[in-house]
């Protein structure tokens, strides 16, 4: 029986400094020695921040902002695949396991599957954190690793959500889906 790949969410904050080497280290490791064992879920980075700013300015709906944030994740994923050609952009959930079995490291682009889905709240209580857990449940992976650039205090997911370290919906979806969620600092060894 083939083991399900781990879902690794690379926070959008990893994309903020192209010279610090953290993003490069994680992507090269995931595309190299860990190839075939992980699916990457990209954060939305500056693209998602732009959606938040535009929503504040224009006051468009949470639903529209959610759909735009999904595309922000797609944009970051496409950028990762261009910067690190060993990574493989994939918008088809059903193909992720096949790509891993073939020894590739897919980067999941979520808008195709989640654009009109009602599986998750369609507002800012859901970010790429909860989306990574949703994907893990969907592909049968029992665990998710969230890679963050911020300080990671001790605490359960509810405490981390209260501190803004993870999104507010994460504790609920992780418990409901029975997914183990771990956090790693971007500077930590893989």
Indicate residue ranges for each PLM-predicted region.
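Nucleotide/pyrophosphate-binding catalytic subdomain
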Residues: 1-189
């Amino acid at each position: 029986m083939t083991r399900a790949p781990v879902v690794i969410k690379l926070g959008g904050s990893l994309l903020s400094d192209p010279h610090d080497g953290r993003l490069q280290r994680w992507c090269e490791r995931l595309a190299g020695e860990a190839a075939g064992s992980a699916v990457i879920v990209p954060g939305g980075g500056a693209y998602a921040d732009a959606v938040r700013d535009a929503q504040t300015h224009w006051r468009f709906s949470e639903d529209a902002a959610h759909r735009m944030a999904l595309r922000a994740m797609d944009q970051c994923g496409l950028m990762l695949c261009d910067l690190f050609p060993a990574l493989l952009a994939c918008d088809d959930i059903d193909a992720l396991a096949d790509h891993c079995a073939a020894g590739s490291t897919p980067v999941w682009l979520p808008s195709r599957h989640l654009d009109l889905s009602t599986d998750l709240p369609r507002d800012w209580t859901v970010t790429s954190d909860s989306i990574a857990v949703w994907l893990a449940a969907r592909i049968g992976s029992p665990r998710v690793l969230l890679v963050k650039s911020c300080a990671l205090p001790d605490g359960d997911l509810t405490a981390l959500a209260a501190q803004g370290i993870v999104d507010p919906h994460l504790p609920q979806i992780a418990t409901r889906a029975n997914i183990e969620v771990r956090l790693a600092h971007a500077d930590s060894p893989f």
